[in-house]
Amino acid sequence: MLKELINRLLWHPKSSPKDYVIIYLHRGAPDNKKSISVNNIIINDSFLVFNETHIPFHRILEIKNLKTGEILYKKVDIDGLR
């Protein structure tokens, strides 16, 4: 589901990837989170690539529309860590 959503944001003719941000778990960053524009990623089988950084899908916490504030995806917090 997550990979399909990201592919849709990247490739659907009515979608503008620069309008979306991916927030992901990055230990050591402020609040253990970093964000990147969907416009700046390359999607792979089980991870995203941003510059030289590989981000596994399981580290994606949220996908958000920057224009509307709509949250398209939010990882379920099952262990109280997020």
UniProtKB/Swiss-Prot annotation:
Highest taxon in the source lineage: Archaea
Protein name: UPF0248 protein Mevan_1298
HAMAP family per the UniProt record, alphabetical: UPF0248
NCBIfam families tied to this protein: PRK04257.1
Short name of any one Pfam family annotated for the protein: MJ1316
Family: Belongs to the UPF0248 family.
